[in-house]
A protein has these predicted regions:
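Glycine-rich beta-alpha junction loops
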Residues: 130-134, 173-177, 209, 242-244, ...
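Acidic, glycine-rich loop-and-beta core segments that form the ion-binding/anion-interacting portion
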Residues: 186-246
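N-terminal capping/small domains of soluble enzymes
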Residues: 2-77, 83-87, 271, 319-325, ...
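Charged (often Lys/Glu-rich) extended helix/loop segments that serve as interaction or gating elements
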Residues: 224, 235, 240-378
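Short, well-ordered secondary-structure micro-motifs
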Residues: 51, 137-140, 179-181, 213-216, ...
C-alpha cells in the first residue's frame, strides 16, 4: 500500500478512491456492453460519503428495509429498490416514500400492501422474489435456497393468477461466485419460471456476483444478461454489493501487547467480533500486508482482539520480525460487510472511517466515541 498511514488513528477503516473507481469502471463497462442496470447492494457497503462517486457509474441502490431505502434516497438520489422478507404495517408508508421499486417476498405480502402502493400517487414498480430451489452455496447461513428457507417464493407456492400489477421478478441465490454459477442458475430459473418472466418488464439477478474479482468470467455474465434480454424482452438488473467494494479498503490496527501461552500471542486494538464479524461468522482468515501463513516466516503469532470474548481470535500469522507494542498491522479487503455489521460489544469503540484520494490525500471522514456507544443503549 502506498498511502502514508503514520497519522491515522487506529483502528480505522480506510477506503482507497483509486481502487473503488477501478471497480466502478469495470461495472460500468458491463452496463455499457449490455444495457443492464447495476445497483449497489447497501447491505454490503453503505459508506454514503462516496455515494456521489458511485452515482456516476451505477443506477442506484438496493435496500434491505426502510432504513437503507432512506439512506439511498437521501444520499444517492437515483433508483431505490427495496426488498425485505416481510414489511411491517407501520413502516410501509416510509418504504413507499423512499422507494421506486418494491420487491415482496410472498403473495400474501403483495396482496396485503398492493392497494396502499397503488393509491400512494407514486410511480412504483412492484416485484416478487423467487426461490428456484437451486443454489451452489455451501455455507447455509448465506444460502437463501437451503431447505426451509424463508426467502422467496418456491415453484410450488407460485400463483400465476396473482400477477396482476407485478412488474418484475427477482432471484438472489449466489454468494461471492463466478458467472458459471449464474449460467447454471439462470437455466433453472428459465425452466421453472420462464413463462412468467415473459410477462414482466424486468428481471433482477440479485447479488453475489463477484464481478470485480480478478478471475471473474465477464463474458459469461454478458451472455447471461443478453440471454435474459433476448428471451424475455426484459430490463435486467444486477445488485452487487461486495463486488463494488471488493479489495478497495483496509482495516488499520495497532499491536497493544504481546504475551506467551504455549505460543506467541499479540493483542490488537481491533476485534474480530466487533470490527470484522464475518471473520468469526464465515469463518475466514483475512490477509495482512507483509504477513504469511503460520511458520512461513520466522515468527508466528496468534492475533486476538481486546474484548473479553475468549474466541475473539482473528487468526494465526507469521512475520519476518517479532511484533512489538505500537506496530501497525493492515488487514486487506475490509470495506464490505464491516462498517455495516460492526458493533460495540464490550464497550468497544467503532473504528474511524478514512478515505484516500489523489486530490485530497488521506482524510478522516468520521470518528466515534462514547456518545455513539451510549446512544444505542438506554
Amino acid at each position: 500500500m502506498d498511502i502514508d498511514i503514520s497519522t491515522l488513528p487506529t483502528p480505522s477503516y480506510l477506503v482507497d478512491q483509486r481502487l473503488l473507481i477501478k471497480n466502478l469502471e469495470l461495472l460500468a463497462s458491463v452496463k455499457e456492453r449490455t444495457g443492464c442496470k447495476i445497483l449497489l447492494a447497501q447491505k454490503a457497503f453503505s459508506m454514503f460519503s462516496v455515494y456521489p462517486l458511485i452515482a456516476k457509474y451505477l443506477d442506484g441502490v438496493t435496500s434491505s428495509g426502510v432504513m437503507e431505502a432512506r439512506l439511498g434516497y437521501e444520499e444517492m438520489g437515483k433508483e431505490v429498490h427495496t426488498y425485505a422478507p416481510a414489511f411491517a404495517d407501520h413502516e410501509m408508508d416510509d418504504v413507499i416514500r423512499y422507494s421506486d421499486h418494491i420487491v415482496f417476498n410472498s403473495f400474501h405480502q403483495w396482496n396485503k400492501f398492493k392497494d396502499k402502493v397503488k393509491s400512494s400517487g407514486k410511480q412504483i414498480e412492484c416485484g416478487l422474489r423467487l426461490n428456484p430451489k437451486y443454489s451452489e452455496i455451501d455455507t447455509d447461513i448465506y444460502n437463501p435456497c437451503f431447505t426451509g428457507s424463508r426467502l422467496g417464493i418456491t415453484p410450488e407456492q407460485f400463483q400465476p393468477d396473482q400477477l396482476d400489477g407485478i412488474d418484475g421478478l427477482h432471484f438472489h441465490t449466489m454468494c461471492v461466485q463466478n458467472s458459471d454459477t449464474l449460467e447454471r442458475t439462470l437455466k433453472v430459473v428459465d425452466d421453472t419460471f420462464g413463462s412468467y418472466i415473459k410477462q414482466m418488464k424486468w428481471l433482477n439477478f440479485g447479488g453475489g456476483h463477484h464481478i470485480t474479482r480478478s478471475d471473474y468470467d465477464i463474458e459469461t455474465l454478458i451472455r447471461c444478461i443478453q440471454f435474459a434480454q433476448d428471451t424475455y424482452g426484459v430490463q435486467v438488473y444486477l445488485e452487487p454489493g461486495e463486488a463494488v467494494a471488493l479489495n478497495t479498503g483496509y482495516l488499520v490496527s495497532t499491536v497493544l501487547d504481546t504475551i506467551e501461552n504455549g505460543m506467541h500471542l499479540a493483542i490488537l486494538d481491533t476485534s474480530a467480533a466487533c470490527h470484522m464479524p464475518d471473520v468469526l461468522e464465515m469463518p475466514y482468515r483475512p490477509h495482512i500486508i507483509g504477513a504469511g501463513v503460520p511458520n512461513e516466516k520466522a515468527y508466528t503469532y496468534r492475533l486476538g482482539g481486546p474484548t473479553c470474548l475468549a474466541g475473539d481470535i482473528i487468526g494465526d500469522y507469521s512475520f519476518d520480525v517479532p511484533l512489538k507494542e505500537g506496530d501497525k498491522l493492515i488487514f486487506c479487503d475490509m470495506a464490505h460487510y464491516t462498517m455495516v455489521k460492526n458493533n460495540t460489544f464490550n464497550g468497544m469503540n467503532l473504528p474511524s472511517i478514512a478515505f484516500y484520494s489523489q486530490e485530497n490525500g488521506l482524510q478522516i471522514i468520521k470518528q466515534f466515541g462514547y456518545e455513539d456507544f451510549k446512544s444505542r443503549l438506554s
